[in-house]
């Protein structure tokens, strides 16, 4: 039925709100005004003007008209209005994304199995019709109030029967759920959907995304940190892909593994399914039929066989006029099963198998469409697995390309929307699979058959499947698998395939792991049962200083650890725990974990918000609050927005680490290099430590790894530690350093800077005590003149007042400034344009403090004479002068040295290092002092 272009159809609905917004339109929640039924209407953008939108719209409509199954969202109506297409769907209350918001620590195991089973059934029906969804993610999985899962959004789905010339888009599927072959730009098939199922299975289990990569290259490395290095064939594709030109993966000799990642969260049976869904080699990955027969779904299969569900059977499933006589033997069994259940699908699947002359068991051995457990097991041999695959992956619709979709009506004009929503009797799933089942013999070379043995070659065939996993491999190719020379990559040169791969293998097979890994984790991959004693030094091994294993000329470990490597890997309990360990299930992540040391060199640490990688979404996902872990839930609370921007190792921190940086006690051990590195890393979140001593990565890791927001933000409020506990000493320093006292010189310096007493220069020590009084008089005399000069020339601008207040508040004088302070840190106390104003202010304040003493009439005549003598003596005998000149030189001329063209840092170092230069030669400083004294005399 052709949908007329009428403008009043939308008037039947009352718009209640906006459900969501996607790349090609908006989804509205509406109520039918007559029936009061709640529906979801997907309103596409201007499809008449935009060819891409039109193509996507047509594709989705074709898919939805074909896919009638209980776990696929139902298309109720389609109409056009003002050039825009409207699709009316059943309304489902929420999606899995919102479910994960409500349950930040994951879903109970039974619900996980139920959701995954329903998802696999929906994908199985798609794959039976040669449709690959390619964008399976929590946002596209709707969940009703009675926990029925619905797969939606077929805008990126692809019909595999479109042939060799089909333009298979590489950028499909949200990045976190994209398979390695998609990321590498390799030919792909149905297994890309199965990879997404494995990722969702992990995310449902603990509430955290399994592979949260922030770019294609980072996604590939994030996968390898858990699953290990890519196979050599995929490495070839990586090095030959121009997008990754010049890049190289760091060695991952000790991947975290799914066992460690989900220890205490997934049972062994469900973990086995997950491992088979997340095989790096797509040829080894489970397809839908193998998943549905997995022992973990035994309860769900029994529920599907329940007779009470057979009453929901739709008549169009058995009214097909195209059923052949060969179908009669299974037609009776088909009536016993639910029309939308997977059992019916597999029965239909088994109908066409005798035509393909496959050596399968008789149809009677199928229970509800599934082989009996003794006959078909997920642990059965690979040859038998491969022999059962044509049913689930044969391309039996190649001949007519789903005739009712590509009907002659659509050949008239591609701009016409010809959408017959009413299903014909011949369009039932039972018959759809049989229309071209005679072609199944010619289409046996589907993607799963290509792996009958890992190194087996494909059998040549005239009618090789055009839509199989190897559809882009040249016909002349007789290579082991899909990953040889794909058209999209060109030939591999010797330099690419030999030298680069040898370098990669050298990294992967590197045996000198003790250089990068603590001895406690060297034998974690050994087949023997490890000893439990390796956890004794867990707390000291948290620093990545011993685990930066990527300083080998690759993209080095320049970034703090990724969110995944912390929250996903560091918090997961290693597999090597046995019964002798004392870790409880409620907190299984306190142990040293395997993927801990793999900092992603491809990560910028600004993790994208969940599920926002493909479509820009206005709604930022609210993360769950931090809460205690329940038994069996081994992860921290669902990441909040702060965690998405930085890696969070969480429980791995020792309990005493309540601030986001190492304690002062740690800083005294780490020396000067770690202190300077820490000061740089505190400036911003994304500083990249390049030091080789391993301490800087430790600082960064402690800086950004707290899972609680208040602790993440606390490092803005806690003063940075100083070397050798001077963090505390600077705060208690007094301002009496202008007086002849030892209090300031003894407490305000670190080990590397000996204390300096301005009153005890070498000349002072050699002179008699009667000169001390003259020193004081000369000092106070110069102070008084200085005060008069500053009163006549007001220069107390805003920054000076601010720096003066800061200086008074911190009670730090010029002599108490550590020599290690960098010039950039001085900007906290003074402006860069006038670096020594604060010193002048400090000295000026000291003179005002001692003003009663300086105004004493006994000192004034002596001070005037003493000042003249000292100034003249400095000119003639600079090194022998030991009276008032020493105090004047030490305390006073430095502010007047500002007119000399010096950098702020050099001026301060000259100020602090006066004691060193004076003992050797005073010539550099004398120039400044002479100019200053000449000015004073005027």
From Swiss-Prot:
Q: What class of enzyme is it?
A: transferase
Q: Which reaction does it catalyse?
A: L-seryl-[protein] + ATP = O-phospho-L-seryl-[protein] + ADP + H(+); L-threonyl-[protein] + ATP = O-phospho-L-threonyl-[protein] + ADP + H(+)
User: Record's family?
Assistant: Belongs to the protein kinase superfamily. CMGC Ser/Thr protein kinase family. CDC2/CDKX subfamily.
The chain residues annotated with the modification Phosphoserine are 407, 479, 720, 761
Its recorded name reads Cyclin-dependent kinase-like 5
Pfam assignment, any one: Pkinase
Residue stretches of biased makeup (Basic and acidic residues): 407-417, 549-559, 679-704, 769-778, 817-827
Residues of the active site are 135 (proton acceptor)
User: What's a GO biological-process term for it?
Assistant: protein localization to nucleus
Q: Which residues form a coiled coil?
A: none
Instruction: Outline the subunit composition.
Output: Interacts with MECP2.
Tell me which species this is from: Mus musculus
Q: What is its main location?
A: nucleus
Signal peptide (residue range): none
């Amino acid at each position: 039925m052709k949908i007329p272009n009428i403008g009043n159809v939308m008037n039947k609905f009352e718009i209640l709100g906006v459900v969501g917004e996607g790349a090609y339109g908006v989804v509205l929640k509406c109520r039918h005004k007559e029936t009061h039924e709640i529906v979801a209407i997907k309103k596409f953008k201007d499809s008449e003007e935009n060819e891409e939108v039109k193509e996507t719209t047509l594709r989705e409509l074709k898919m939805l008209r074909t896919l009638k199954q209980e776990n696929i969202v139902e298309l109720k109506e389609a109409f056009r209005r003002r050039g825009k297409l409207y699709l009316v769907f059943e309304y489902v209350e929420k999606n899995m994304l919102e479910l994960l918001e409500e349950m930040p620590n994951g879903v109970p195991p039974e619900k996980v199995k139920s959701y995954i089973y329903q998802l696999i059934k929906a994908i199985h029906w798609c794959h039976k019709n040669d449709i690959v969804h390619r964008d399976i993610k929590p946002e596209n999985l709707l969940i009703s109030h009675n926990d029925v899962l619905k797969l939606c959004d077929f805008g990126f789905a692809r019909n595999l029967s479109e042939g060799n010339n089909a333009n298979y888009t590489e950028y499909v599927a949200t990045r976190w759920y994209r398979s390695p072959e998609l990321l590498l730009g390799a030919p792909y098939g149905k297994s890309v959907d199965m990879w997404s199922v494995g990722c969702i299975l992990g995310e449902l289990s603990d509430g955290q995304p399994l592979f949260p990569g922030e770019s294609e290259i980072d996604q590939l490395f994030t996968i390898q940190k858990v699953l290990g290095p890519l196979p050599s064939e995929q490495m070839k594709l990586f090095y030959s892909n121009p997008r990754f030109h010049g890049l190289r993966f760091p060695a991952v000799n000790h991947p975290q593994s799914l066992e460690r990642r989900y220890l205490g969260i997934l049972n062994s049976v469900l973990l086995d399914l997950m491992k088979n869904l997340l095989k790096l080699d797509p040829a080894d990955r489970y397809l839908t039929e193998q998943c549905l027969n997995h022992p973990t779904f035994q309860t769900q299969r029994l529920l599907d066989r329940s007779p009470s569900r057979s009453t929901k059977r739709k008549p169009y499933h058995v009214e097909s006029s195209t059923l052949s006589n060969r179908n009669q033997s299974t037609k009776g069994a088909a009536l016993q099963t639910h029309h939308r259940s997977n059992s019916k699908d597999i029965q239909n699947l088994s109908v066409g198998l005798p035509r393909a002359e496959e050596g399968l068991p008789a149809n009677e051995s199928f229970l509800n469409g599934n082989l009996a457990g003794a006959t078909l097991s997920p642990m059965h041999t690979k040859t038998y697995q491969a022999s059962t695959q044509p049913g689930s992956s044969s391309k039996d619709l190649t001949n007519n390309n789903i005739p009712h979709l590509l009907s002659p009506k659509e050949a008239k004009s591609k701009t016409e929307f010809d959408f017959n929503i009413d299903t014909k009797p011949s369009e039932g799933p039972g018959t759809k699979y049989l229309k071209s089942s005679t072609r199944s013999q010619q289409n046996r070379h589907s993607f799963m058959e290509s792996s009958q043995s890992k190194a087996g070659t494909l059998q040549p065939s005239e009618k090789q499947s055009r839509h199989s996993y190897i559809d882009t491999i040249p016909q002349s190719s007789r290579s082991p698998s899909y990953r040889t020379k794909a058209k999209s990559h060109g030939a591999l040169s010797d330099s690419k395939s030999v030298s680069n791969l040898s370098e990669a293998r050298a990294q992967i097979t590197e045996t000198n792991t003790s250089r990068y890994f603590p001895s406690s984790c060297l034998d974690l991959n050994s087949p023997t049962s490890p000893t439990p004693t390796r956890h004794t030094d867990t707390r000291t091994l948290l620093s990545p200083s011993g685990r930066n294993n990527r300083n080998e000329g690759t993209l080095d470990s320049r970034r703090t650890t990724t969110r995944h490597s912390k929250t996903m890997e560091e918090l997961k309990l290693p597999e090597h725990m046995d019964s002798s360990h004392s870790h409880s299930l409620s907190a299984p992540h306190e142990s040293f974990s395997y993927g801990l040391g793999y900092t992603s060199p491809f990560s910028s640490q600004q993790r994208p918000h969940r599920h926002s990688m493909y479509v820009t979404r206005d709604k930022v996902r609210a993360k769950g609050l931090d809460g205690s872990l329940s038994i069996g839930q081994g992860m921290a609370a669902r990441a909040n927005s702060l965690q998405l921007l930085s890696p969070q190792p969480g429980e791995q921190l020792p309990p005493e680490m309540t601030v986001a940086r190492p304690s002062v006690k740690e800083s005294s051990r780490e020396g000067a290099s770690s202190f300077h590195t820490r000061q740089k890393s505190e400036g911003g979140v994304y500083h990249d430590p390049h030091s080789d001593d391993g301490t800087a990565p430790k600082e960064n890791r402690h800086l950004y790894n707290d899972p609680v927001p208040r602790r993440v933000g606390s490092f803005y409020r806690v003063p940075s530690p100083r070397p050798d506990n001077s963090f505390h000493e600077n705060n208690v320093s007094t301002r009496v350093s202008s007086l002849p006292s030892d209090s300031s010189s003894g407490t305000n310096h670190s080990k590397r800077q000996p204390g300096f007493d301005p009153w005890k220069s070498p000349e002072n020590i050699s002179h008699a005590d009667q000169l001390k009084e003259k020193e004081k008089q000369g000092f106070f005399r110069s102070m008084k003149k200085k005060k008069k000069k500053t009163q006549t020339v007001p220069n107390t601008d805003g920054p000076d007042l601010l720096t003066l207040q800061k200086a008074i508040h911190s009670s730090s004088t010029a002599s108490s400034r550590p020599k290690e302070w960098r010039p950039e840190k001085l900007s906290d106390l003074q402006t860069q344009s006038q670096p020594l104003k604060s010193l002048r202010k400090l000295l000026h304040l000291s003179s005002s403090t001692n003003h009663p003493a300086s105004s004493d009439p006994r000192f004034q005549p002596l001070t005037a004479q003493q000042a003249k003598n000292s100034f003249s003596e400095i000119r003639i005998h600079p090194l022998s002068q030991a009276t008032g000149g020493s105090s004047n030189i030490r305390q006073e001329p430095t502010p007047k040295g500002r007119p000399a063209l010096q950098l702020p840092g050099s001026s301060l170092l000259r100020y602090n290092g006066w004691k060193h230069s004076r003992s050797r030669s005073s010539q550099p400083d004398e120039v400044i002092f002479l100019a200053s004294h000449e000015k004073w005399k005027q």
